[in-house]
Amino acid sequence: MDPKIKFIQGNEVCVEAALYAGLNFFAGYAIPPSTEIADPLCSRLPKQGGKFIQMEDEIASMAAIIGASLTGKKVMTATSGPGFSLMQEALGYAIMTEIPCVIVNVQRGGPSTGLPTSVGQGDVMQARWGTHGHHETIAPTASHHHHHFPTT
């Protein structure tokens, strides 16, 4: 095998893409299966001059990235299913006020805690239309691992 070829999971691709794009602020709460994004960023982001904050919940995570984005930071948080539900009010605020934020929703297979450590595609509708108000939401999704890098 070519030594330049490396097999990695979608969450790992997301981390590499975010760092490559200049991510300099991450706030998150550990919730599987999105923990695989927070874990490597915890050690790697500070080495690149960025800030990593472990928050008390998903609501605070969303509030933190909104605040950091307002100061000019490139921001991201990662969550899954029920955590994404908790972010909806703050997400709606960010959309209405046009505050740039990247929210990675690593979707679980099945409803809410159906398969908490596996992934699925059931949250696409919530990503697109989950908040209150009448506004447009950009909700890109990756259909294959090699799409994760440009999507992130």
Q: What is each model feature region?
A:
Residues M1-W129:
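Thiamine diphosphate
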Residues S118-T152:
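Conserved thiamine diphosphate
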